[in-house]
């Protein structure tokens, strides 16, 4: 009996000790990352405003690209695979995210947005979060298991501070690494780091990438509108898979045609500049949050999501930095907005469904997608978001933005597959 009591005391001591440790560590690291993310957010807002006030600065995009390639080369990070490296680090004991990544990705993303590259900034968030977490783990002499947990918590913090969706930020790093397996050991650290980081960003009045969107027109779920949601979900799955194919093939062929990274980045920049002057609009440059917001009120043109794909592929595949998730939200919102005319459905609910549907298709993260929907659009349309996310997740197959993402369990049957995404 005494032996059992002793074991129980030891078990409770370990549990409460672990809770205290992770609350303190994740709270401090989340607050620190919140400060970095807030500064980064203000930098992106400033460079975007400067670009919009001085549109001809886009002619400097090739020079910006050359600077980015040079910075990665002199720091020995020219082979850095970005977010794919982060996914590998969490699964493997052999890789790590070096400290150099934080200044490199933040500066490179700011340069990309200053000169008009079409990209997001969540790639930067996940990478600098993982980099900070890795450095902290080293200085704190954490073991390999705790290091991976603190990296996930740091990713949650960065995502939360920039996107303003802390609940989605908690789940995304745990869900995106290996589809079908959740890293629940990181749940407590991810929760406290995400909310600490968001608290700092709110305190500093950071403008998030995705402000809440008002969805007023929610149809009756038990009607023909639920069938329309399935049709929209199919479109989201197809477009999401297409976006992944365009990005991966774009990277492959640009490397094949332009083996020299300096020539490659100039070629990509030239493509963006030519398209910009041909179309005479800056709607596809930078984050494109203005277009996302407009998609909820006005019907988007059928070409908009396709052009955003093209601009983003030329930018990121050439060697510029930022991320693919905000472009995927742009693509989803404009696709949904356009589909609203075909489906004879309200524009705002279709744009919202399009955003979460394409996000789910390209990340294979259905739980995160639903949490994003709840935090951005509220719960009124949740039955529609559930349908769109579920169908889009299934029909997008094994495509993903991230080549190092793994599908652990099949999407169509209860079967262990453990395969890399396409």
Residue ranges and their predicted role:
Residues 1-422:
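Alpha-helical transmembrane segments and immediately membrane-proximal extracytoplasmic
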């Amino acid at each position: 009996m005494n032996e059992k009591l002793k074991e129980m005391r030891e078990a409770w001591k370990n549990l409460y000790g672990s809770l205290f440790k992770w609350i303190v560590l994740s709270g401090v690291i989340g607050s620190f990352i919140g400060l970095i993310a807030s500064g980064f957010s203000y930098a992106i807002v400033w460079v975007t405003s400067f670009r919009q006030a001085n549109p001809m600065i886009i002619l400097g995009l090739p020079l910006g690209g050359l600077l980015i390639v040079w910075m990665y080369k002199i720091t020995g990070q020219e082979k850095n695979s970005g977010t794919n490296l982060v996914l590998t680090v969490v699964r493997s004991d052999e890789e790590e995210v070096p400290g150099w990544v934080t200044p490199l990705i933040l500066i490179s993303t700011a340069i990309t947005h200053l000169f008009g590259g079409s990209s997001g900034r969540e790639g930067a968030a996940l990478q600098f979060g993982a980099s900070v977490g890795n450095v902290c783990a080293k200085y704190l002499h954490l073991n390999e298991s705790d290091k991976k947990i603190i990296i996930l918590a740091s990713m949650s913090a960065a995502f939360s501070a920039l996107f303003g969706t802390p609940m989605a930020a908690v789940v995304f790093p745990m869900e995106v690494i290996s589809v079908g397996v959740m890293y629940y050991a990181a749940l407590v650290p991810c929760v406290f780091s995400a909310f600490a980081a968001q608290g700092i960003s709110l305190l500093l009045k950071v403008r998030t990438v995705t402000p809440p969107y008002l969805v007023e027109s929610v149809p009756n779920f038990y009607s023909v509108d639920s069938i329309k949601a399935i049709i929209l979900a199919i479109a989201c799955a197809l477009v999401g898979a297409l976006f992944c194919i365009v990005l991966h093939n774009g990277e492959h062929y640009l490397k094949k045609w332009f083996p020299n990274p300096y020539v490659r980045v100039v070629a990509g920049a030239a493509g963006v500049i030519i398209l910009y002057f041909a179309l005479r609009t800056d709607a596809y440059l930078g984050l494109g949050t203005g277009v996302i917001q407009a998609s909820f009120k006005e019907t988007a043109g059928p070409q908009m999501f396709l052009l955003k794909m093209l601009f983003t592929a030329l930018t990121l595949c050439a060697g510029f930095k930022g991320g693919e998730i905000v472009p995927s939200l742009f693509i989803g919102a404009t696709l949904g907005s356009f589909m609203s005319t075909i489906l004879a459905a309200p524009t705002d609910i279709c744009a919202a469904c399009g955003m979460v549907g394409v996000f789910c298709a390209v990340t294979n993260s259905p739980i995160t997608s639903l949490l994003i929907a709840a935090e951005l659009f509220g719960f009124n349309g949740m039955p529609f978001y559930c349908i769109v996310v579920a169908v889009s997740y299934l029909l997008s197959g094994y495509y993903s933005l991230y080549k190092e993402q793994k599908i652990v369990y099949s999407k169509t049957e209860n079967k262990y597959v453990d395969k890399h995404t396409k």
